[in-house]
Every structure is written in structure tokens, then in C-alpha cells.
């Protein structure tokens, strides 16, 4: 799955999170700022997997733009926004293509 996502001026590699590590630590994703990695569990279903990616990207945005939050506060914000955004995108399948079209400057 080795892909990259550019956030701010940094590129972050998206990698598979080992399923044993994921299960032992009860996590589906991990943002590793110093390694420039977003690690995702390969055991999640599609919607949950997308939600986890959004969640970890939000952690990267908070880090990259230097937003000063304690860990508990940051986790709550990432969970809330990721869950809300995932729900909006699932419930409105036309929305993401519409946004992409407008970002490309297409009519």
C-alpha cells in the first residue's frame, strides 16, 4: 500500500500497521511524526479504514500546523471530526466527486 500524502510541506508515507501490533495495542492507525509515517491496520472494513485514514491525517494537520493541544484533547478533536466527516461523505456520495471537480477547476 506504500503511498504518500502531502500535508503542509511534508510527505507522509502510508504504510500497513502490522495486524499483531494493531490487535495487541487495540489501535487501527498511528501517526508517527518523526518518521513521517501514517500506519493503518489492514484488518478494517472499507468505511472504518477510510475513517481511520481521515483521523490520522487530522493528527498530521494538527502537528504540521503546530496546533498546541494535550493528547486527550487532540484525540477527541480527531475522533469527532473524522467521524463527522466520514458520516457526511458516506451519506452524500456525490459530495467527494463534487469537491474534487471544483478543486481541479472543472465546471
Q: Residue ranges of each PLM-predicted region?
A:
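Active-site recognition of the HExxH zinc-binding catalytic motif
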Residues: 51-63
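Metalloprotease/metallohydrolase-associated module, dominated by Zn2+-dependent proteases
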Residues: 1-48, 64-107
Amino acid at each position: 500500500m506504500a503511498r504518500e500524502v502531502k500535508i503542509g510541506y511534508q510527505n507522509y508515507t502510508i504504510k500497513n500497521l502490522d495486524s499483531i501490533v494493531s490487535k495487541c495495542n487495540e489501535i487501527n492507525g498511528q501517526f508517527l511524526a518523526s518518521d513521517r509515517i501514517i500506519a493503518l491496520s489492514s484488518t478494517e472494513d472499507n468505511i472504518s479504514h477510510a475513517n481511520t485514514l481521515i483521523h490520522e491525517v487530522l493528527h498530521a494537520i494538527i502537528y504540521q500546523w503546530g496546533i498546541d493541544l494535550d493528547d486527550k484533547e487532540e484525540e477527541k478533536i480527531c475522533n469527532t471530526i473524522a467521524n463527522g466527516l466520514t458520516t457526511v461523505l458516506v451519506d452524500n456520495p456525490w459530495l467527494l466527486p463534487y469537491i474534487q471537480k471544483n478543486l481541479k477547476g472543472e465546471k
